[in-house]
Every structure is written in structure tokens, then in C-alpha cells.
Regions:
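N-terminal regions that are enriched for targeting/export leaders
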Residues: 1-96, 170, 174-176
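Extended, compositionally biased non-globular segments
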Residues: 324-353
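Internal, well-ordered alpha/beta segment that forms a basic, Gly-enriched binding/recognition surface
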Residues: 123-220
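N-terminal, positively charged nucleic-acid-binding surface of large information/translation enzymes
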Residues: 2-33, 37-38, 51-53, 109, ...
């Protein structure tokens, strides 16, 4: 790669109250959908994990639609959601946290674009990330000034993975909307947090992140939006993810070279001296190649970096502290390898980007 191979546009969020930044413009959404279809149709000679790109793309489409329908119908009526084999998918996503309106704005844009292009709107719940905070900042008025007060909705748990984190302190969790309302009464007469929190508490799940996302999704449907939600962790257990993972594992050395070269180019173009920004380069430890993936087992509270040793007949997967070692036989068919990767994730080992 060289510095001229990629051109970065300078994008800047607007500073005015009520302003928004949408790129590309919503008016061009249909043309972008058509361009993507044409681009993907040209990938006729690409094979990933023993499957053609076209077949893998169709498999991934089927998986995400099925998974999104199965997940969403546990708390919403999907009678009016119709999906056909030719339906396009428009996608967005975010961590299932108490995010600000600027993030929520994406979901309204998603719904508008889907209706404009007669597509299926899917919100990807980024639950493979970590819980960054269990509190929010609320404006509080004192005699002389307005300050920000931190109000916690829960305590921090031993595991900080969003997809597995449950409620740590029921009393703290249940009293959250009232404690926020007590601080906001000077500024907001009827905060929507109370009705939102009722949906949070009624959600048929023990995972806090899913409680937040399901409550948010129900509010959206009450406002006339029509979309599906699906946790990314669910897709990571599917066959299409496993097949992509197999392709990366088998080509670990080449993948690492391309990945690190892209980081170096980005740093040069933006004149970044911090070697860890935007992300660290992948390492090689002895004969083990690091991949941009996390792994954990039921016995490890924290996620660990994933490493792969590649031989002619097998792939050896392990984490940095060597809490596990898995051997994937390459003498069998790619489909059998995919089944083995899926089987590991159904038992004790998890792989996430």
C-alpha cells in the first residue's frame, strides 16, 4: 500500500442546535442499494471457506433475516413485517446502552430509508462489546449553577461483556428512574425514562443490554417504525460467520500482513504517532499468529486475544494465557470444519470480533 491508494474525506459533525449530518444523503439511498447489488454480483470468482461468495452471501442473508425475526418476535408482534427472497436489507447498529438522541437518530433514518426503498430495516445489537459504564450524567441545578451529576443504574459486575451481563443490584436498578426524575424535575416535567423503564423491567430476558434494546425497540414501533433487531452474538454462532472465520484462520499470516499494512497506511495519512491508534498491530508470538478476534470460555471472566498456529493438516487455536487449545482438522471438508467451529461455540468457547 502507499499513501495515495486511499483517499480520506474530512467529515465534521454540525455544531448548530437541531442540525444533522447524513452521508450519503437519504435521497441517494436507492441508487446506493442498486450499486451494491451490482458490485456483489460481479464477485463471481471469489471463494470463502470453500463456498462461493454468492452462496455465502445468500446464506448470510437467510441467517440474519431468520435470526432477526426469531429474536424480535419474542417481544413484538411481527404480523405486518413481510420479507421476500428479493427484499433488500438496510442495516445499522449500536451497543445496547442508554445512548444519547444523536445515536438513536440513526434508527429513525434507517426506518425512513427502508420505507423509501421498500427494504427490510435491521438493527444490529452490538452486544459483543464491553460494558463501558453503568451510569449516566444528569443535569442538576444548584443555587448558582447547573452541574452534571452521575447517577448509576447498576453496579459493575465481574464480567463486563454486554452479552452476558445481568442485573447486579435489583434495588439500585429499580430505583433508577425515580432518582433521575428527582434531578430532572427542574428541567423536564415528564421524562420518558419512567415509561421506558417499565418496558425494561418487563423484558423477557435477564441480560441488561437486551432489556435496554427491547424496550427501545418497542418504543420505536409505538412511534410507527417497522424494523427487526438481532444480537450480533447470535450471528457469531451461525454458519456464515464460522465460514468467514475459517477463511481468516487458514490465511492467518496473509491476513495479518494486510491488516497491519492498512493500519500503517492510516497512521501515515493522518500523521498518527501513537502505535496503538486506531488499533494495535497484530503480533506473532513464536509460531502463533494473532487475529483481530476475542475469545473466552465459561471459566474465564475476561475476554482474551485469539491466536492461531497454521500447519498443513490442522489449525491450533489458543488465547494468550493458554487457557485453552483447540485443534481443527484440515484434512476434512470445509463444511465439516465449519460445523466444528459452530460446535465449539455451542459448548464452552466463544469467538467474537
Amino acid at each position: 500500500m502507499n499513501q495515495a491508494s486511499i483517499t480520506y474525506r474530512k467529515l465534521q459533525a454540525p455544531s448548530g442546535n437541531g442540525d444533522c449530518f447524513i452521508e450519503p444523503p437519504v435521497s441517494e439511498s436507492l441508487s446506493y442499494l442498486h450499486a451494491n447489488h451490482q458490485r456483489f454480483a460481479a464477485f463471481t470468482d471469489i471463494e470463502i471457506g470453500g463456498l462461493s461468495f454468492t452462496a455465502l452471501r445468500q446464506q448470510a442473508r437467510d441467517e440474519i433475516i431468520t435470526a432477526a425475526q426469531e429474536h424480535t418476535k419474542t417481544y413484538l408482534d411481527l404480523t405486518n413485517t413481510e420479507v421476500t427472497a428479493t427484499t433488500s436489507i438496510v442495516l445499522t447498529g449500536h451497543q445496547p446502552t442508554l445512548f444519547h438522541p444523536g445515536v438513536w437518530f440513526k434508527n429513525f433514518c434507517l426506518d425512513h430509508i427502508a420505507k423509501r426503498t421498500q427494504s427490510l430495516a435491521v438493527n444490529l445489537i452490538i452486544d459483543h462489546d464491553l460494558v463501558k459504564s453503568t451510569s449516566i450524567k444528569v443535569p442538576s441545578q444548584t443555587r448558582n449553577a447547573v452541574t452534571l451529576k452521575t447517577i448509576a443504574y447498576d453496579l459493575s459486575g465481574s464480567s463486563n461483556r454486554i452479552e452476558t451481563t445481568g442485573i447486579q443490584d435489583e434495588n439500585l436498578f429499580n430505583s433508577f428512574p425515580q432518582r433521575v426524575a428527582d434531578q430532572l424535575d427542574v428541567f423536564v416535567e415528564n421524562p420518558m425514562l419512567e415509561s421506558f423503564w417499565e418496558l425494561v423491567q418487563q423484558a423477557p430476558t435477564d441480560v441488561v443490554g437486551q432489556k435496554f434494546s427491547q424496550a427501545r425497540h418497542q418504543l420505536e414501533h409505538r412511534m410507527g417504525m417497522n424494523s427487526l433487531d438481532v444480537p450480533f452474538s447470535t450471528l457469531c454462532r451461525g454458519a456464515s460467520f464460522a465460514r468467514c472465520l475459517l477463511h481468516v484462520l487458514k490465511n492467518a499470516a496473509r491476513f495479518r500482513d494486510i491488516y497491519n499494512a492498512a493500519i500503517c497506511e492510516y497512521q501515515k495519512v493522518h500523521r498518527i504517532r501513537n502505535p496503538g491508534h486506531p488499533v494495535p498491530e497484530l503480533e506473532i508470538l513464536s509460531d502463533r499468529i494473532e487475529l483481530p478476534l476475542w475469545s473466552w470460555t465459561s471459566s474465564t471472566a475476561q475476554r482474551q486475544r485469539l491466536f492461531c498456529q497454521v500447519t498443513a493438516e490442522q489449525l491450533i487455536l489458543s488465547d494468550l494465557p493458554a487457557s485453552f487449545e483447540l485443534r481443527l482438522d484440515l484434512t476434512v471438508s470445509p463444511s465439516e470444519c465449519v460445523e466444528q467451529l459452530q460446535a465449539w461455540q455451542q459448548t464452552d468457547i466463544q469467538f467474537r470480533p
